[in-house]
């Protein structure tokens, strides 16, 4: 106690570093329910959610999950795993995330297209490392969350390895990237017959209403606003998401498809909405109602 400043502690959490096969380090941040006295006591089965762009979203997701303990429908929470980079003074490593979060294509730009390598790293390195830290906890289900390029990653993971996770959460996915190449994967996914009797995965897609139709800020110059509005129209964040959902509607390989537009949110502000809603539904409202 006293008035001497000290660092702000974050209970029920830890972080560590893992390297991929190329020797590149990743920051792995993990949190678990605030009411746990320790993480070694046998518990479960519990859900776990993996979140990319972890530097920007770990605290947001952790606090959102902890706040649910005061809700009437709290189901015990789950484990949050955020995957990021060793950074100081910033939240994003533009070069590394551009490679890690975009799918491989025949005409991928230089420095992009490493999603499969990154997903292999999550499955073969991150997942076992996290599970080793909770030896007495049994896992019920797993989700993958990503925003923007991360949302594109979540879609690519669903379309190419649908059994890797039980739920894929694509927040404001960059469907526009590389001439809408992800839609070719979506088409192949829809046209492939389901061969397994296991429950199909679910998909959540969301975006902010201001992403495609931004308002003008009070202090914004008209020329700047017009340029920003043109870019928003070209990216078609809402329309692309709606087109994708229409393509996937009724797909037998999906258990549920949930689409949400967050009114009055832009590409940055919508992150807190989608991560809170995504983990809340995945932790507490599972299984989702089956799509018709």
Curated annotation (Swiss-Prot):
PANTHER family per the record?
SIDEROPHORE TRIACETYLFUSARININE C ESTERASE, SIDEROPHORE-DEGRADING ESTERASE (EUROFUNG)
Protein family membership: Belongs to the esterase D family.
Keyword Cytoplasm among record annotations? yes
Task: Give this protein's Gene Ontology molecular function annotations.
Answer: hydrolase activity, acting on ester bonds
Purpose of the protein: Displays specific triacetylfusarinine C (TAFC) esterase activity but does not hydrolyze fusarinine C, which has the same core structure as TAFC. Hydrolysis optimizes but is not essential for TAFC-mediated iron uptake. Both extra- and intracellular siderophores have been shown to be crucial for the virulence. Subsequent to chelation of iron and uptake, FsC and TAFC are hydrolyzed and the iron is transferred to the metabolism or to the intracellular siderophore ferricrocin (FC) for transport and storage of iron.
Which reaction is this enzyme known to catalyze?
A: triacetylfusarinine C + 3 H2O = 3 N-acetylfusarinine + Fe(3+)
UniProt KW RNA-binding keyword: no
Q: What is its EC number?
A: 3.1.-.-
- Official protein name in the record: Siderophore triacetylfusarinine C esterase
Q: What is known of its domains?
A: Ser-174 seems to provide a hub for substrate coordination, potentially playing a decisive role in recognition and selectivity.
Task: Please report what switches on or represses expression of this protein.
Answer: Expression is induced during iron deprivation.
Influence of temperature on activity: Optimum temperature is 25 to 37 degrees Celsius.
Coiled-coil ranges per UniProt: none
Q: Which residues bind triacetylfusarinine C?
A: 97, 148-149, 174, 176, 267
Gene3D superfamilies in UniProt? alpha/beta hydrolase (3.40.50.1820)
GO CC annotations on file? cytoplasm
Among InterPro entries, the record links this protein to:
AB_hydrolase_fold (IPR029058), Esterase-like (IPR000801), Siderophore_Hydrolase_D (IPR052558)
